[in-house]
């Protein structure tokens, strides 16, 4: 006899199948859709991190941060290890999340210096924490900056790093054992250009006497064991890689990468889900830039922090906001995971877990892991568009409360034209910074003189502040007017203003 739970699962599967079919999809479009167990998780090499991460990583929020009374967050972490997941995320802004990792790490014998320390297991995992503190020295009162921590008021960047190590490997009161380290520290949630200015302060020109030193210069010291900032007198090496996270502004994220003349940034954690193209999107703007720099690319917000389902479109505020079901009758979770993981450039996705269960079909961790068993090109463009069609009506398309609203294709930025004499010839050089893509990718830039197109330059991800450029030799001595037009994949255009060149 079929039980009520079986009837519920069957009805849910029927409704999901109907929803997929209405969008032009079938269950067969998605590898692992109906599978709940994974023998050996797929991995992807994470660019210059030189680590093969499982395609699903454990997010540090959901029940690890906002823990319901009947949930033991330690069991979630231990189950992730048991399932073979090897990428783990947390932050100094996630309340008890780091302490919960600490409890699990003790059970797993991951505490350096303690009897039975499992160094092999520690080397096989990748542990990332984050700091929202933009300054390593001074700067606390500067306006226009998000500067935040769950640590002590007035803390600086390195205080957060030591806090992470103490909570996860030490006594939780500030001490941590020799040999404890973080695989990576991310500058958490950059949202404004002023924050980019702050974190870069002093990088490459560190002066221990400086009044203000940004986060990056100090993190480099604690990565390399150097003391260029004067903030690492013991020459400690507490972290191995440095990166940043951003879910608000692709422009800010791009600026962060383009300023990195010292190749400090090894990874980016970025929001990317099926409603991305309804906003100032990441997939056609910053993600290609990070990929071109060979950065490790970690995705987040696959379910829009639960807003794809039962949670309102706002930041999580308490345990009641935590989503504890697997998808919904009308919106399966698997395709959303696979959308994220088939976004070109993405290596892994971190997803917070609200609920685990002995029944694999009801276990968020197992279902998400099964869905994550997909190759980078595992969905076609039409499959991805069909998934977007499913998620667009959710919350009237406003699930991504953390992301800037949609904007159309922009004109090339900072366009300029100058002339000079070279080998007796008059040469005009036109330069510009990348345009921002709308809901379709950029393809090329067209250069115009006196309302006539004279050439084009293929778009490519702009990985530094060095501008795009076009030159031509001009045979006359007259005045001319130049402009640059951005063109996207569907032929839409956006032109710069006129750039006047005076008579030679």
Where would I find each of the regions flagged by the language model?
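Extracellular fibronectin type III
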Residues: 489-504
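N-terminal binding-site loop/beta-alpha segment at the start of enzyme catalytic domains
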Residues: 2-126
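Conserved, mostly hydrophobic/aromatic
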Residues: 46, 58, 88, 127, ...
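Recognizes extended acidic, P/S/T-rich segments that occur
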Residues: 444-477, 490
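Structured C-terminal cap/extension of enzyme domains
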Residues: 261-264, 285-425, 431-437, 441-443
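Glycine/proline-rich, positively charged
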Residues: 141, 146-274, 291-298
